[in-house]
């Protein structure tokens, strides 16, 4: 008897935002105390962001990941001990090592010895992690994967730089992916170009117990915008081609929630109506690797994304990295 083709499909989603919601006006008031001028109108006009969430000083990235993971596991209705692969996409890990994924595995009480590791592709991290987990499952190496995007970007923001500190927030999103004979993940594409590493980076490093270089995020906004709008359409089309789907067959587009102008530009280039694009950047800000699974969970739980629908995710981030996946939910 011929062996059936193995696929991976999304069983459940989850997300978590720390309770400290900071509006643009509240952030502007904080910055004004240090002589930094900005306003709600200025931020909204350039980014579409109205608010973001910041984690408390004693809350770690793995803490955020833990809650999102619990919610995804509950939604998937799986035994945590059946999860034999954990991938955490983050650029703000708890420690230099061990990985946030190992810390999360322990917090979840998973004792089966399954693989656990982090992926560092910044805002493309979740797209990278999802594609990697899909490959592991399709080849039979693992059967049930927990993929988490989690960030505490507030820890690396320079609050004297209004061009970056107004953009980012903290949060986590998660999905449970499981082996299935029914197609789920239909096509993925991943890319990087290290020659653009300087346009979005946090260049500091630990050297003999001292942070060498800047530990703050640095960004050339214009260069990032120009590159992002160019590569996102191309990688989306590539993933669609691998999935044997046309753009008009996509029910929902979930772009990395970086900036409403980048998001709408990609949506327009793909010929999709704006109504099919999931937008959470207005309330969450840019949560880097957490932004796509956060938006996915919001749209699943409010009933917009339904079983059987086609979803296209795409992300672009520091590195420079970019990626996309198409899946049937």
From Swiss-Prot:
| Entry GO MF terms | 3-oxoacyl-[acyl-carrier-protein] synthase activity; beta-ketoacyl-acyl-carrier-protein synthase III activity
Task: Please provide the Gene Ontology terms (biological process) for this protein.
Answer: fatty acid biosynthetic process; secondary metabolite biosynthetic process
Q: Where are its TM segments located? A: none
Pathway connected to this protein: Lipid metabolism; fatty acid biosynthesis
Question: What does the UniProt keyword field contain?
Answer: Acyltransferase, Cytoplasm, Fatty acid biosynthesis, Fatty acid metabolism, Lipid biosynthesis, Lipid metabolism, Multifunctional enzyme, Transferase
Which Pfam families would you find in this protein's record?
ACP_syn_III, ACP_syn_III_C
Q: Where do the record's region annotations for ACP-binding lie? A: 257-261
Subcellular location(s) of the protein: Cytoplasm
Its domain of life? Bacteria
Its GO CC terms are: cytoplasm
Question: What's the chief localization of this chain?
Answer: cytoplasm
EC assignment: the record states: 2.3.1.180
Question: Per its UniProt entry, what is the enzyme's top EC class, as one word?
Answer: transferase
Query: Catalytic residues per the record?
Result: 123, 256, 286
Q: Which SUPFAM superfamilies match?
A: Thiolase-like
Q: What does this protein do?
A: Catalyzes the condensation reaction of fatty acid synthesis by the addition to an acyl acceptor of two carbons from malonyl-ACP. Catalyzes the first condensation reaction which initiates fatty acid synthesis and may therefore play a role in governing the total rate of fatty acid production. Possesses both acetoacetyl-ACP synthase and acetyl transacylase activities. Its substrate specificity determines the biosynthesis of branched-chain and/or straight-chain of fatty acids.
Domain remarks? The last Arg residue of the ACP-binding site is essential for the weak association between ACP/AcpP and FabH.
What is the protein's name according to its record?
A: Beta-ketoacyl-[acyl-carrier-protein] synthase III
